[in-house]
Amino acid sequence: QQIQRTGEALTTAGVLEAATAADYAVNLVQVEHPASNDLREAVYRLSHQAIDGLVVVQAGRAGREQLVLPPSMPVAVSDSTLVDYYPSASADQVGGVRDAVGHLLELGHRTVHHVCGPEDSQSSLIRRATWARTLREAGREVPEPVPGDWEAAAGYEAGLRLAPDPEVTAVFCANDELALGLIRAMHEQGRRVPSDVSVVGFDGLAVGEYSFPPLTTVRQDFKRHGHEMVDLVLEQAASGPLDGSRSIIIPTELLVRGSTAPPTP
């Protein structure tokens, strides 16, 4: 995981809270590049310590070969390709994106542009694929997605790129920080939000409630996310291994605020 990222930090706080409540201590290991040997080496080091279980908050596109565990080691993973192999807890990415895009279409926008998260993030890839699929199912044009990462600076650059196009009236950003950067760029370029352009984020960070205008977003329950993963590990520690297909999907919630409105006629 990368603790400086807001989502991972909030999920980690949930892990710490749940583990502490169960009278467990937590060792944190930050892995810069999960798809490289960094994750394998981190797991190797941890597995040779006296640990009772492993929670992988974020592993991106890491393959199963990167997570080599001792037999019967309790483990829980999240939002990565590893969810196909190990017990997992993840936000309802698909439902959240459908809510966001559907909200913009219901307001009357002809289509919805998208600013992506990073290519090495499974969550980002799911959000992009679901955005495109939702538009196709509604019979709408699927615009070229704008590449980005999780940072506000990338959203700002995307906003500068999209602002000159008067056909851009609605944008779904892969996270709130991208959305906040994009809104600033739109304002600087004379595009009013939401009068000229509606913007929706994803995550439900507290700062979005105090942006101008307040950000419409899809809220994830990061604390519950951390709690569920700890519960999966504790269940395995008490009762033995769980089926790798065991998956907990945590609902998301669309928070409609001031950054979305019907398109100006």
Report the location of each language-model feature.
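Flexible loop/turn connectors
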Residues: 142, 164-265
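Short acidic/polar active-site loop segments enriched in Thr and Asp
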Residues: 52, 110-112, 168-169
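Alpha-helical recognition/docking segments in bacterial nutrient-uptake
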Residues: 1-102
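Hinge/beta->alpha junction and helix N-cap segments in small-molecule ligand-binding domains
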Residues: 1-10, 28-37, 60, 89-99, ...
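Conserved hydrophobic residues forming the short capping helix/wall of the S-adenosyl-L-methionine
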Residues: 19, 134-135, 186, 237
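Helix C-cap/helix->beta junction micro-motif
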Residues: 22, 71-73, 138, 189, ...
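Glycine-rich phosphate/diphosphate-binding loops that line cofactor/substrate pockets in enzymes
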Residues: 101-112
